[in-house]
């Protein structure tokens, strides 16, 4: 079973993403901060991560670095309002597998998630 980890501090968006990406063969785990995300990653089994950059307890880019150092096989899609070319290039150069700016289309998000899985 695929396991998606959503790390997004906006509760409404987090819940909406969870609902939109849920499938029979997919488990959704959601966190709203880095601390909870790190605890969840220690449990293992994550197939893909949707990661916001601006979180209440730090930068998602710092967590991205840790993920790519410790579990490089897990695809990470950055999901953020930071939408300048410089932000996008920075996120991809730091190891993100994809970069989606808010606001976004759910159909595009689903397609990008499915491509990474």
Where are these regions (language model features)?
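Acidic, metal-coordinating helix/loop segments flanking the phosphotransfer/catalytic sites
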Residues: 30-48
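Acidic catalytic/metal-coordinating carboxylates
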Residues: 33, 59-62
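Active-site residues of response regulator receiver
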Residues: 52, 80
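Two-component/phosphorelay signaling modules centered on CheY-like receiver
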Residues: 10-29
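The feature encodes the CheY-like receiver
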Residues: 56, 84
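Conserved acidic carboxylate
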Residues: 8, 55
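Short amphipathic alpha-helix used as the core "switch/output" element in two-component signaling
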Residues: 61-72
